[in-house]
């Protein structure tokens, strides 16, 4: 099958430096891969997509999500709480309220939000598991992704020991056994994991948080099994100052040192957040090639802080973007996340500016992140972290994962540089098309077979059901 995208106004590649922008204006796709980029002549019987006045980006790669939280947006008990109190008030409070129907609907809503922003690959850190569960949340995540044509990286969360904020949970939601957790990871790898470059299904070892979800000896065994199986490792780390306090109190070391002691650093490992890091931790992450899923909107919503991507990237840490769960980020789409990352990295550097009489050397932080940087983090960076070696950039020979944005909303009127529109202007740009492995999964801003109005009504009913079950 041959497909040609013609007349693009601008193309961002996901590559660094001068290669970040491509002249185009045409892209030919054959057998799911990019075959040519330049001024091309259509071939006989070649399907064409006219991208006139459109901007093309690599399809976004979201490296951290909790899809089940898509039915927990704006939940009042946790709306103005910081992380630990929010965990008790919202996600832990509602975990037992989910059944197969509400879980499936939440996953579908989250995936649709991402699709409509130009995201085709999603790492879902799913931690809704308990013994004798009457439905298989892993199967639901994969099947919903398949129905929408998306690439799913299932990060198999869970815990084999509890923490203080979980002590009041129903018995059914208490920690799993270590043997049960490990056996299920092996089951999932055997059934779903596909290591091929064009794969649409991957599995990751992902205990919910390394400091609290399992004893150190078990963490080592998890890392060992993951590497034997050829899968990656993921977890939360250093989201707030509480991680520093907990690691010192429990282990007499920093959180990153704890990870190093238990074989949880390396280029096959990435952590969500990494907001509160000491300089020596940044250096250690960089030396080992351990990655970050930067979640600026969730970190802002919970008041956790802003990760120092400048220092992390300079140290050698691979950088990617994640939307986190919608219970702490009501704008859980990749365009919103990219816009926030662009602004907040600049604001973070600007907060460090000092007057010259006090030794300051710069006025502000506008050079901290370019739109091209953010596109690279959200595409090539994500693909690198997830081990998708043939995805993430627009280059000949790469998988054709790309988003064609139609900049026809008033927010884009007056732009001098259309290429930056999908990131710089915020909001959601309509999609001319979204392709994964060269196959359109969104066309003319519509997802085939999806009834958004019915989904809206289902969501309203599901929220009421969850509130009743959680008695809030």
Regions inferred by a protein language model and the residue ranges of each:
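Active-site microenvironment of metallo-dependent hydrolases
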Residues: 1-25, 30, 40, 372-472
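Divalent metal-coordination and catalytic microenvironments
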Residues: 8, 27, 32, 53, ...
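Active-site gating loops and adjacent loop-to-helix segments of metal-dependent hydrolytic enzymes
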Residues: 71-103, 161-178, 241-268, 288-291, ...
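Alpha-helical scaffold segments that flank or form the walls of functional sites
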Residues: 74-125, 130-151, 183-197, 460-471
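Metal-coordinating catalytic core of metallo-dependent amide/deamination hydrolases
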Residues: 132-275, 280
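Glycine-enriched alpha-helix->loop->beta-strand junction motifs that scaffold or abut catalytic
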Residues: 149, 227-232, 264-267, 284-293, ...
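His/Asp/Glu-enriched, well-ordered alpha-helical/loop segment
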Residues: 261-268, 310-407
